[in-house]
Amino acid sequence: MKKNLLLIFFILFSTKSQASVKNEIIKSFSEIENLNFEFTQTINGKDETGNCSIVFPKKIYCKYNFRFNKVLVSNGSSLVIRSDKNNQYYRYSLKDTALNLLLDKKYILKKMRNLKGSLIDEKFFLFSIEENNQTLNIFFDKDNYNLIGWQTEDIYQNLTITYIYDLKVNQNIEDKIFKLPKNN
């Protein structure tokens, strides 16, 4: 009987509770001003890689490791995707994209505080945010509380999964990278 009680006590107190993990993720995320990372993005089964810088609120610069020099940039209000492939240049209002939610740290923190969150495979912690017919799934590492990726639909309703790695937090990032590229 004592062995069973000891085992139950050990199990209950040796694993972090979901509430504890959630609180640590919120604390860690609230301290972030900017992020630099490498990424792998999967859209419709096709993988692309690259690197990104995010400055909260609402700025992102991503350069893809792609032969067409694809760049994605938001200055906080507009989003531009530029590629040398057929001289492509697309400009969108940021508020019309799922990135509008992802790049708004205050909004994400508010939502995370009100959501339960889910533990996935004892490794990842998921927050699923729904807003304006958009779903944003944000994944964090359960052990170090770092952001590890997100899943959403792009502006064409394609499922987009982004996995991030080599994460660096609160680095010096020059604001000029968020200047929107010109249409050639």
Per-segment meaning from a language model:
Residues I32-N34, D47, P57, S74-G76, ...:
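Extracytoplasmic
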Residues Q41, K58, Y64-F68, G76-S78, ...:
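A mature extracytoplasmic/lumenal domain signature
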Residues K27-D47:
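A short, Trp-centered hydrophobic/proline-enriched beta-strand micro-motif
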Residues K85-F124:
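Flexible, surface-exposed loop/linker segments and immediately adjacent secondary-structure boundaries
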Residues C52-L101, T160:
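An acidic-aromatic
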Residues N4-F13:
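Sec-dependent N-terminal signal peptides
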Residues K110-N184:
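Gly/Pro-enriched, hydrophobic low-complexity segments
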Residues S17-A19:
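Boundary at the C-terminal end of the N-terminal hydrophobic targeting segment
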